[in-house]
Amino acid sequence: VSLYNQTNEIPIKPTPVIGMVGSNQDLKKINSNKFCNIGNKILVLGKQLEKNLSPYLLQDQNLASNINEYNDLEELDLDYEKKVADCVLKMSDFKYIMSCNDISRGGVFLSLLKMQYKDMGFKVNIPDPIDLFCEYSAGYVIEIRNEDLNNVSSFLSKNGVGYFEIGEIIKENIEINSKKFDYFDIINNYHNNFEKIIN
């Protein structure tokens, strides 16, 4: 934590960094963080997607003046976080989950980009595409086989964990609400736009 722990006369709340390691006795139970098969379904576990769960959008729209104000808006529910994480682990044991990525940093959209692999892209339908940028620590993007949807739905409902289906894995393309995007254009903008703006 910086000794000068404030900016613009507003204090910056300290953020402890915790490093963790774990052990796994069965290599077959380790899930991929990359898409596995074209045609599989994509689900989001956790709360419903909402704009106010994106700190960057709130700042961009002047709804929150800084990250500190956003942090005050989002109240942690550690019990729910553990419940969702436990469900992910159990579904992994049941071999329902083919791949998985959390949405705690960068939201659903960044998780989907990270999960792209080889010639596999994704097609999703979201009522408001801005919701793709919402992020929270108790949320996960998971890939499941079509035939496992009923079992996954029953398991999550029984354990009180929300979920919703957002799309499927397709060949190469990125489609959001039927609009196509180029993966390499997105990555190029992500890495280079800031430099263009400040020059």
Give, region by region, the residue ranges found by the protein language model:
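Glycine-/acidic-rich phosphate or pyrophosphate-binding loops and their flanking alpha/beta elements
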Residues: 26-38, 58-62, 83-91, 125-130
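Glycine- and other small-residue-rich loops at beta-strand/loop junctions that grip anionic moieties
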Residues: 34, 77, 101
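Glycine-rich anion-binding loops of enzyme active sites
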Residues: 1-54, 165-168
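Glycine-/charge-enriched secondary-structure boundary and capping motifs
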Residues: 1-17, 70-72, 85-199
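Gly-rich Lys/Arg/Thr-decorated short loops/hinges at beta-loop-alpha junctions or inter-strand turns
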Residues: 50-75
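C-terminal transmembrane module of polytopic alpha-helical membrane proteins
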Residues: 76-83
